[in-house]
């Protein structure tokens, strides 16, 4: 029996769902939780798939599960198969005359806070019957979500070329790093230096994220380091609440606090920045066919930019 024929007879949807979940989540543990499976059961299914394909699809290590080149290639096909099945299912349950358009957006937490409120308001003036699903996630999760078909539109950062395969990127703006505090913070009563700032409790993004890399670069450029007693979180809402209500110093991308700075809810410390800023843009799949709702959402994001 030919190898391709054997593959097509033995491949199952559970193999594709498992593979796509691991690609999206980045670790076997998180993928197992998403699929409500035990990790050994998920590992067994993944091993079966690699035996069927005759290729190693992931490199497993301390950093999680990273797609290999054959894995990247297989992901494109796996997503198309699952998309086709989902589309077929939706077509069977769609009621004639009803608008069932759903637009799925994945955004960096700071981008969601800084960009999306006004965008969503504008969007729903035109698309009152469209369901808008918004998830905040890290940049690797946005890229994986686009490739696996979990989201239609991403608002995030350009990544390494091998991770951008199959994706389009459209620059929106450059985002600088700000150090912000509440209006009556004691630091505002003195000449501020970075070393003095770090004597106060700080809120930063977790290690491995772009905002954290920029925060580390800033403090290291002045011979300092982020204190061990810091708060690490991806939650922009939690970070904002800690900063508004207490004496925390928040290391935050500028887009997330532009309204707070304009209304003086938060104040930026006069600490010199480091670097030119981080490019934030719209991410989509190269082979995507957009619904009218998706296209209107993209247009609303573009129109929200101040240029």
Swiss-Prot record:
Residues 11-68 form the HTH lysR-type domain. Keywords: DNA-binding, Transcription, Transcription regulation. The gene is ydcI. InterPro entries: HTH-type_LysR_regulators (IPR050950), LysR_subst-bd (IPR005119), Tscrpt_reg_HTH_LysR (IPR000847), WH-like_DNA-bd_sf (IPR036388), WH_DNA-bd_sf (IPR036390). Residues 28-47 bind DNA. One of its GO terms (biological process) is negative regulation of DNA-templated transcription. This is Uncharacterized HTH-type transcriptional regulator YdcI. The keyword Amino-acid biosynthesis does not apply. It comes from Escherichia coli (strain K12). It comes from the Bacteria. GO terms for cellular component: cytosol. GO terms for molecular function: DNA binding; DNA-binding transcription factor activity; sequence-specific DNA binding. The keyword rRNA-binding does not apply. Signal peptide: none annotated.
